């Protein structure tokens, strides 16, 4: 099992699919990485040589922000918005949708389970 960017990627899958197990690498970035390293698209992870795995690691370390660094950066961006007190920061702080969705109905994923209000009848 190859270990890239601190993640054990599955060995039987194609390289293009296996790279997507790394947080921060989706279809587009995985295709770009495979193209840069010049690995055939049908190659599986267990068929990679140590040199190819090393090249993949180098490309990811040099060109992409992945895993812990990406999570930390995202968290810091949200914290910065909350500290500024801007509208988006307030929405994050209150646990409400940030991007303008309606909240009168729906938004249950963001708001959590419905809370019963005592004495409220229709």
UniProtKB/Swiss-Prot annotation:
The keyword rRNA processing does not apply. One of its GO terms (cellular component) is small ribosomal subunit. PROSITE patterns: RIBOSOMAL_S13_1, RIBOSOMAL_S13_2. The keyword Cytoplasm does not apply. Residues 99-122 are annotated as: Disordered. It comes from Rhodopseudomonas palustris (strain BisA53). One of its GO terms (biological process) is translation. This is Small ribosomal subunit protein uS13. Located at the top of the head of the 30S subunit, it contacts several helices of the 16S rRNA. In the 70S ribosome it contacts the 23S rRNA (bridge B1a) and protein L5 of the 50S subunit (bridge B1b), connecting the 2 subunits; these bridges are implicated in subunit movement. Contacts the tRNAs in the A and P-sites. Keywords: Ribonucleoprotein, Ribosomal protein, RNA-binding, rRNA-binding, tRNA-binding. Belongs to the universal ribosomal protein uS13 family. Part of the 30S ribosomal subunit. Forms a loose heterodimer with protein S19. Forms two bridges to the 50S subunit in the 70S ribosome.
